[in-house]
């Protein structure tokens, strides 16, 4: 299934990208369908992180983000610098708005 999807993709948008998903992507682990699709994919990759601020600023997460950002045709968008998080805390780590997500996907698809 993941091979077929990867061959048809014009863009791969990871929304939301958790710390765990980003770690798997950065290190080439494929324990689930999403990360298997990522490894089989050759289309541009848009990564939209969303997690608790402490998780986002952790050195391991920042290192994984840097690894991914350095890869060809990869772009990390976000997270927001502040806002209400899913855990109920306020701070950095919030997913960017749907408008930003759509804009980034359309920009990637339109030369």
Model feature map: region roles:
Residues 1-32, 36-46, 53-111:
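A cross-family phosphate/adenosyl-ligand binding-site feature
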């Amino acid at each position: 299934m993941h091979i077929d999807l990867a061959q048809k993709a014009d863009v791969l948008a990871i929304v939301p990208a958790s710390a765990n998903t980003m770690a798997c992507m950065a290190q080439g682990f494929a324990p689930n369908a999403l990360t298997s699709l990522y490894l089989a994919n050759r289309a541009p990759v848009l990564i939209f992180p969303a997690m608790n601020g402490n998780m986002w600023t952790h050195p391991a997460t920042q290192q994984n983000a840097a690894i991914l950002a350095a890869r060809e045709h990869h772009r990390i968008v976000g997270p927001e610098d502040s806002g209400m998080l899913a855990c109920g805390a306020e701070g950095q780590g919030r997913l960017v708005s749907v408008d930003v997500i759509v804009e980034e996907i359309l920009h990637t698809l339109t030369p």
